[in-house]
Amino acid sequence: IRDLRRSRGLGDVYKRRELVVRLNCQRTKHGLLDLEAIASNKLKVKAIMLPKVKTPDEITFIDDMLTDCGLDTDLHVIMETNQALESIYDIAHSSDRIVALYFGGEDMAAELRVENKLENLVYARSRLVHAGASKGVDVIDVPYLNLEDMEGMKKEAQFVKNLGFTGKGSIHPKQISILNEIFTPTEEEISKAKRIMDQFKKANTGLVVIDGKLIERPVLREMQRKLLVANKINKS
């Protein structure tokens, strides 16, 4: 009975999680076999993660395949090649299935012939943020690999958040709570977002003044995103 209760509890937890399957590179034999397995079995997962994407055509091909299979699977795309860096805007807009863009720091640093340090990859990260913002999708930073340097991870996470990233990957459970704290909207941010939303509803104009500061309508999308994130966190 105890095991049954425990299994039910775990089941409830997993119901609140999204299953994302990372495939091998789609330009390799193993990647094509992964895609074949999804197509032949009509595997229903929330999303598939695509590494080392280089061109929009790769995304279009996979989108068409999923459509032919009758699957509504989302796509998570990792930018970790120089070719992808130059094409990331077009890649981001190549499919409505794309809901998240990821930054692959190790491979990107190797391609750019630089050390994988934060200051060396600000430009590449910024290009990804701009592409993600133009599409209105999440932008997720590469995990911090030093498990003993929690302070370093905090600083890097805060930096990329300020840059425009909406999240950061993790490689160990002990990193998760810290990252959630950084990327989850604070009570103050939530309250401000609600005030801005309410003011625009009442004003029915393109701008409002809150606390003496002029706020224009384009800000609404970010306020909506913060409230959606906060609502999702509260339900988890």
Role assignments for model-derived ranges:
Residues 2, 8, 12-236:
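Expand to "…catalyze enediolate/carbanion chemistry for C-C bond making/breaking, isomerization
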